[in-house]
């Protein structure tokens, strides 16, 4: 089984992104028969979509797990519904606001 595990680079003035740190901390050699590919996406509305498509095409994973960080939450949440809206009141790391 191939798992693509994705985090994001820091943004919004933060020095670290908890999703990036979590992906880094996952031990890849402890699960027999499981190949975990760890990747980081840019916090860029223009680049992230292209990059995730490239990663999936190149690695052909069985499962894709994407982690994220929300400044609005102080605990872990599982997102049940992803709306995939390009909507934000804050700039991405390219200075772009959709």
Identify what each model region corresponds to.
Residues 1-98:
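N-terminal catalytic or cofactor-binding beta/alpha core of small enzyme domains
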């Amino acid at each position: 089984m191939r798992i693509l595990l994705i985090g994001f680079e820091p943004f919004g003035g933060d020095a670290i992104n908890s999703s990036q740190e979590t992906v880094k901390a996952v031990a890849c050699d402890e699960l027999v028969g499981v190949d975990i590919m760890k990747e980081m996406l840019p916090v860029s509305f223009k680049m992230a979509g292209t990059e995730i498509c490239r990663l999936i095409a190149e690695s052909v994973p069985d499962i894709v797990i994407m982690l994220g960080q929300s400044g609005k939450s102080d605990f872990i949440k599982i997102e049940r519904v992803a709306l995939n809206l390009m909507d934000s009141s804050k700039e991405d790391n390219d200075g772009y606001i959709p």
